[in-house]
């Protein structure tokens, strides 16, 4: 436990931020899981809509500083490859 007043405040804000980040990351993972399910079912129209939603959430993660630019770029690339391979 921290003894310094400022460190106690920082610990509180860090915990609040951590909880927001965990919640946000969970919503991104859910969107990607839905996209993967649409890809498995070979439903291209639904997959394109979900791809757009996933892109939106990943880009929002960059602006919120939850994800790095390279992480998002890699995931977007991999997801688009999967969607483009649907026949």
Curated annotation (Swiss-Prot):
Keyword Ribosomal protein (UniProt): yes
Keywords, in A-Z order: Ribonucleoprotein, Ribosomal protein, RNA-binding, rRNA-binding
InterPro entries according to UniProt: Ribosomal_bS20 (IPR002583), Ribosomal_bS20_sf (IPR036510)
Domain of life: Bacteria
Listed GO CC annotations: cytosol; small ribosomal subunit
Compositional bias (Basic residues): 7-20
Record Pfam families: Ribosomal_S20p
Annotated stretches, region: Disordered: 1-21
GO BP terms: translation
Gene Ontology molecular functions: small ribosomal subunit rRNA binding; structural constituent of ribosome
PANTHER family per UniProt: 30S RIBOSOMAL PROTEIN S20, SMALL RIBOSOMAL SUBUNIT PROTEIN BS20C
Function: Binds directly to 16S ribosomal RNA.
Family: Belongs to the bacterial ribosomal protein bS20 family.
Protein name, entry field: Small ribosomal subunit protein bS20
């Amino acid at each position: 436990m921290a003894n310094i007043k400022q460190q106690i405040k920082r610990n509180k804000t860090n915990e609040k931020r951590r909880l927001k980040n965990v919640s946000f990351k969970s919503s991104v993972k859910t969107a990607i899981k839905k996209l993967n399910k649409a890809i498995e079912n070979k439903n291209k129209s639904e997959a394109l809509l979900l791809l757009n939603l996933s892109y939106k959430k990943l880009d929002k993660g960059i602006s919120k500083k939850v994800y790095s630019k390279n992480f998002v770029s890699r995931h977007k690339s991999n997801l688009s490859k999967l969607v483009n391979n649907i026949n």
